[in-house]
């Protein structure tokens, strides 16, 4: 197999990979209710106390009496009716590259609802079919002050001698928000409550594009399952209802995630459901009994922010797995760590990608050299193989035997030119996912006209240069292909690749371009070495 056939193999493998992942995203029917306005009410969102995952009857009790909570990285809007987070702005991330507006992860708008809810159900709960508690606050705006590392925002409600205090606890430079329920029972009898925390979002499908497939939907982690996606289609087909001591429930989208993590040593209930065009995923903490004259605090943590692996891993076990590298995670994860380490030194993600390319291609150089050497030996055998075919004609069995004897005599592995390519493809695919899933590349500039490595090149300069580099590799590579159709396909291959890469994120195109430049340099060195051995001629 010669170099040009290798290029064809790479193209077929790569395009097949893209088509497969897109089919994998699209092979299920579209969920219902996408893009339509839903009539939503807060009390109808409250899960039942029974733990069966079914909602209680809807009731019209909604409020927009809001308070705002601001830190250095988060701006939250909280409804005082129940204390739901109905908006979350990520202050360190712009909505668009050229926009000064912050990215809004959670929002509650007509036709587009994505909020984080929490409350108390049970015999003495304050969130039920009859309505939700109107919580009292001391101010409308709360801000983390300069020099302050923690902000606590209490919201209170008093009923039947019991004081319920819902407190949002936020820390500087953190996307983890602790939600505490303190129940001070000064009544004459014991009180029984159960805390729930859930995420609610419109049922929708966001599979991205062929070149950048993305997932939008649910996910969870339990004692027995580190990480599993549970799509909106899954929620409509079957509601989850499972018990776990450790775990979390989350909603995912490209680059960002929201998740509830119960803070309880006892088993919690993890559930999903779909109702009225909305999908829910959440957790119920175990039922708690508070004796008369005592108080107790129940806590769950809300992660609402970007997919930052180190920070998420510190917040909850396996939450970092929401950065989904697919089945090649064991390659992609170390590549991302190496990329991040390089960026911490050079200070630019584009330069880090270039450096990573040099490191990866340098590590694979022995394979590349073995590949070119094997192909050169195969070319030297072509006259003998041609003569053998003419001599043996249609006797395929004898032809196969004599070919194997010739390969053994000349110490040539007929798969030697193909195997290195097959071994290199998983590395490229893993790097592809590493770059696609890295929120750090979002809106990160390179040089000149590249202002966002996660977006396509606005002027298509990098894809065109990549196409030119592929064409140069072809021209430098000797070939034994004589079939006119194969020659046309190989000539067209750089054009096809250039077209595909027009729509790829510029960070990935940069990797491929630099990789091609390295290939040209390695080809030159290897061919010079082969010339000295008489295995290559210019």
From Swiss-Prot:
Q: Fill in the subunit field for this protein.
A: Interacts with the Sec translocase complex via SecD. Specifically interacts with transmembrane segments of nascent integral membrane proteins during membrane integration.
Q: List the GO biological process terms.
A: protein insertion into membrane; protein transport
Residues crossing the lipid bilayer are: 6-26, 340-360, 415-435, 453-473, 494-514
Task: List the protein's name.
Answer: Membrane protein insertase YidC
Keywords from UniProt, A to Z, are: Cell inner membrane, Cell membrane, Chaperone, Membrane, Protein transport, Transmembrane, Transmembrane helix, Transport
Residue ranges for the region (Disordered) are 28-62
Where found in the cell?
Cell inner membrane
């Amino acid at each position: 197999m010669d170099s040009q056939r290798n290029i064809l193999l790479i193209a077929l493998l790569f395009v097949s990979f893209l088509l497969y992942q897109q089919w994998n995203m699209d092979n299920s029917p579209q969920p219902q209710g996408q893009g339509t306005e839903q009539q939503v009410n807060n009390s109808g969102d409250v899960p039942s106390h029974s733990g069966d995952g079914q909602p209680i009857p809807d009731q019209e009790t909604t409020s927009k009496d809001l308070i705002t909570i601001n830190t250095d990285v988060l701006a939250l809007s909280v409804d005082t009716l129940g204390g739901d987070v109905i908006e979350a702005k990520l202050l360190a991330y712009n909505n668009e590259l050229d926009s000064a507006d912050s990215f809004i992860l959670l929002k509650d708008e007509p036709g587009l609802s994505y909020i984080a809810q929490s409350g108390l159900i049970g015999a003495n709960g304050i969130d039920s079919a009859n309505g939700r508690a109107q919580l009292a606050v001391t101010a409308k705006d709360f801000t983390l002050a300069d020099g302050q590392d923690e902000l606590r925002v209490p919201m209170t409600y008093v009923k039947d001698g019991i004081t319920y205090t819902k407190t949002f606890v936020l820390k500087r430079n953190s996307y983890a928000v602790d939600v505490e329920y303190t129940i001070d029972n000064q009544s004459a009898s014991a009180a029984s409550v159960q805390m729930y925390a859930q995420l609610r979002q419109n049922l929708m499908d966001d599979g991205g594009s062929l070149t950048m497939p993305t997932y939008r939907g649910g996910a969870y982690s339990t004692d027995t399952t580190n990480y599993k996606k549970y799509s909106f289609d899954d929620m409509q087909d079957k509601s989850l209802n499972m018990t776990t001591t450790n775990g979390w429930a989350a909603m995912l989208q490209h680059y960002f995630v929201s998740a509830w993590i119960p803070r309880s040593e006892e088993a919690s209930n993890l559930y999903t459901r779909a109702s009225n065009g909305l999908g829910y995923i959440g957790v119920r903490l175990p039922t708690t009994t508070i004796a008369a004259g005592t108080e107790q605090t129940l806590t769950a943590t809300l992660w609402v922010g970007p997919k930052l692996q180190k920070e998420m891993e510190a917040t909850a076990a396996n939450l970092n797995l929401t950065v989904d590298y697919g089945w090649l995670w064991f390659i992609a994860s170390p590549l991302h760590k190496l990329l991040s380490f390089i960026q911490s030194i050079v200070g630019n993600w584009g330069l880090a990608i270039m450096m990573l390319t040099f490191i990866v291609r340098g590590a694979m150089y022995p394979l590349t050299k073995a590949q070119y050497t094997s192909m050169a030996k195969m070319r030297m055998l072509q006259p003998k193989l041609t003569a053998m075919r003419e001599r043996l004609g249609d006797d395929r069995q004898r032809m196969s035997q004599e070919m194997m004897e010739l390969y053994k005599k000349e110490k040539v592995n007929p798969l030697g030119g193909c195997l290195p390519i097959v071994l290199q493809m998983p590395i490229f695919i893993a790097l592809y996912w590493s770059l696609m899933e890295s929120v750090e590349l979002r809106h990160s500039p390179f040089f000149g006209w590249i202002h966002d490595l996660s977006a396509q090149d606005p002027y298509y300069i990098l894809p065109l240069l990549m196409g030119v580099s592929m064409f140069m590799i072809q021209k430098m590579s000797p070939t034994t292909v004589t079939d006119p159709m194969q020659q046309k396909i190989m000539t067209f291959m750089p054009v096809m690749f250039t077209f595909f890469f027009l729509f790829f994120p510029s960070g990935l195109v940069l990797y491929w371009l630099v990789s091609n430049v390295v290939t040209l340099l390695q080809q030159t060195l290897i061919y010079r070495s082969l010339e000295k051995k008489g295995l290559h001629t210019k």
